[in-house]
């Protein structure tokens, strides 16, 4: 990366990387350091929040689902300490509903895994007008409902009874929906 491209980062080049996939985290940290960032890494929500409390970074790349909780907790903590920070949320589950939640919590952008270092750098450095336009074809109500059911189902560790209780629906109704939409 040329020196003029480093200037685009500004004087504070601190970058927090939070992901529970150690191999991915190590590779990404190395790639981002080559691009001029000064990286700090964390593998859990609690470690990420501790780094934010100690010294809030100018940039952050945070995985949505971590072993000890939701990456949005780190996004929220960083927004409180440093409102102007540029935050990209990564996830293996590219659902529109979670993207909206991440942006509402203060994320600058949302990328699905596997995202390469160039995509992440572009998202971190994108100016407001450079952000992609919203999709032209919004999701159908049925699709939104299915994603919500899937999200609650995963939150309940795939326990049908608990999921049905949280969704206020009969267990057998939920089982039929899951059976109908599940891949065969």
Swiss-Prot record:
Keyword vocabulary terms for this entry: Activator, DNA-binding, Phosphoprotein, Transcription, Transcription regulation, Two-component regulatory system
Keyword Membrane listed: no
PROSITE patterns: RESPONSE_REGULATORY (PS50110)
Residue numbers of 4-aspartylphosphate PTMs: 63
Top-level division of the source organism's lineage: Bacteria
Domain Response regulatory: 14-128
GO molecular function, one term: phosphorelay response regulator activity
CDD domains: REC_RegA-like
Pfam families: Response_reg
Post-translational modification note: Phosphorylated by RegB.
Function text: Member of the two-component regulatory system RegB/RegA. Involved in transactivating anaerobic expression of the photosynthetic apparatus. It is a transcriptional regulator that is responsible for activating expression of the puf, puh, and puc operons in response to a decrease in oxygen tension.
The protein, known as: Photosynthetic apparatus regulatory protein RegA
UniProt organism field: Rhodobacter capsulatus (Rhodopseudomonas capsulata)
């Amino acid at each position: 990366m040329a020196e003029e491209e480093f200037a685009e980062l500004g004087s504070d080049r601190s970058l927090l990387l939070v992901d529970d996939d150690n191999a991915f985290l190590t590779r990404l940290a190395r790639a981002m350091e080559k691009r001029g960032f000064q990286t700090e890494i964390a593998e859990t929500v609690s470690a990420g929040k501790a780094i934010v409390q100690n010294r809030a970074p100018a940039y952050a790349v945070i995985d949505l689902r971590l072993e000890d909780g939701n990456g949005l907790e780190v996004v929220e903590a960083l927004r409180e300490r440093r409102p102007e920070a540029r935050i990209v949320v990564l996830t293996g589950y590219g659902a529109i509903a979670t993207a909206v939640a991440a942006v509402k919590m203060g994320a600058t952008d949302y990328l699905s895994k596997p995202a390469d270092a160039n995509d992440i750098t572009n998202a971190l450095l994108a100016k407001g007008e450079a952000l992609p336009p919203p999709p032209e074809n919004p999701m159908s109500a049925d699709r939104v409902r299915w994603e919500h059911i899937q999200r609650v189902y995963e939150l309940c560790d795939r326990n049908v009874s608990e999921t049905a209780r949280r969704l206020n629906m009969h267990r057998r109704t939920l089982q039929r929906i899951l059976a109908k939409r599940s891949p065969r």
